[in-house]
Design a protein with these regions (language model features):
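Substrate-binding N-lobe of the ribokinase-like
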Residues: 2-9, 14, 20-21, 42, ...
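Active-site metal-binding loops of divalent metal-dependent hydrolases
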Residues: 27, 163, 283
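Conserved beta-alpha-beta core of the PfkB/ribokinase-like small-molecule kinase fold
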Residues: 37-46, 115-130, 134-136, 142-144, ...
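Residue-level marker for buried hydrophobic side chains located in beta-strands
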Residues: 21-23, 187, 206, 244
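Extended acidic/charged loop-beta regions that coordinate divalent cations
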Residues: 31-34
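Acidic-leg catalytic submotif of subtilisin-like serine proteases
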Residues: 18-29
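Conserved phosphate-binding/catalytic region of the ribokinase-like
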Residues: 3-11, 135, 154, 171-186, ...
Length: 338
């Protein structure tokens, strides 16, 4: 059942009053090179892009912090960057957005992740990735855990944003979960399909997309299971999650809350126009976690996250959703449902 306008407004209005959320994850930059193709190269059968615009945007877990900022939620970003010019750019972009850099750890053995998308108005031509996927070393792990331990004293919850770039391990994930659950604080996980599911055991909220959910339960030995309710129940039973949300793209979101009736609920998608899905999952986890911390039920939080994702998929590239856009989107959605 869709929320009332007053309830939705109340949840979103509470965002600015929340204590900061810690975001731990793989960090990087999304670069967009935009232009027009008018000819094919004489050197090879490839298009020639005449560049008209370029811009850099906070990406990966940094996009989660950027989305929290856009929703008027305070956060601290914690992760590893290289000792290179792109690491300086990460810090510059964070400072430009009014986000602190206290949680960044530099590692000269790593390359700062940088993803360049070459695109026209109608299609993406290619993507160029610069990154290191090797596991962080023991010294870097020790430094990360120390920062997280310190931040847990002043933060209301944590989002684990795993992009499979080498930051996370079972040791780090379980340490984060233990630190925050000892203080009865929310631990939300946006998983990587390449990481073993056991890494995330015991988290409060687990938010895979549908493809990730299938890959994860197959990794657990359930190769033929396709029923969403059964999948959600396997996740909460075997991995001891309190809440599960599976994002379904055009079909909305499926959720199961062990603190509720324990039955699967599905809400329809809030997106009525899709231009680019880049970063929509980051927006959703930011909005859902903020809503739960604001006292929303899982279903209410899912509606907020659903609408926030609906805002950003209408925009080009890694995009943000403001509080004003979120409220307006929900108002329009209610009118459509009526």
């Amino acid at each position: 059942m869709i929320l009332t306008q007053d309830k939705f407004q109340s949840i979103v209005d509470s965002f600015s009053k929340l204590s900061p959320i810690l975001v731990v994850g793989d960090l990087g930059i999304d670069k967009y090179t935009f232009g027009e193709v008018r000819r094919i190269s004489p050197e090879a059968p490839v298009p020639v892009l005449e560049v008209s615009k370029e811009w850099d945007k906070l990406g990966l877990a940094a996009n989660v912090s950027d989305n929290l900022k856009s929703l008027d939620v305070a956060s601290t970003l914690c992760g590893v960057i290289g000792e290179d010019s792109r690491a300086n750019l990460v810090e510059h972009l964070l400072e430009e957005r009014g986000l602190n850099t206290w949680g960044l750890i530099r590692d000269k053995s790593r390359m700062t992740t940088y993803k360049e998308r070459v695109t026209t108005a109608t299609q993406q031509i290619c993507r160029v990735d610069y990154e290191t996927k090797d596991q962080i070393d023991e010294e870097t792990l020790r430094r990360i855990v120390g920062r997280i331990q310190d931040f847990s004293q002043t933060h209301s919850g944590v989002i684990i944003e795993d992009y499979g770039k080498g930051l996370f391990s079972e040791t780090l994930c379980q340490r984060i979960i233990s630190i925050f659950k000892e203080k009865n604080l929310i631990v939300a996980v946006d998983p990587s399909r390449s990481s073993p599911p056991s890494w995330y055991k015991g988290a409060t909220l687990f938010k895979p997309n549908k493809v990730e959910a299938h890959i994860i339960i197959e990794a657990m030995g359930y190769f033929k299971e396709r029923n969403l309710e059964t999948i959600a129940k396997i996740l909460v039973d075997k991995l001891q999650f309190e809440k599960v949300i599976i994002t379904l793209g055009a079909d909305g979101m499926a959720m199961l809350d062990t603190k509720g009736d324990g039955k699967l609920q599905i809400i329809p998608t809030a997106a009525n126009e899709v231009f680019d899905v880049s970063g929509a999952g980051d927006t959703a986890i930011a909005a859902i976690t903020s809503s739960l911390l604001a006292g929303a039920s899982l279903e209410e939080a899912a509606w907020v996250g659903n609408c926030a994702a609906g805002v950003v998929v209408k925009k080009r590239g890694t995009a943000l959703c403001s509080k004003a856009e979120l409220i307006e989107y929900f108002q329009n959605l209610r009118q459509l449902i009526k």
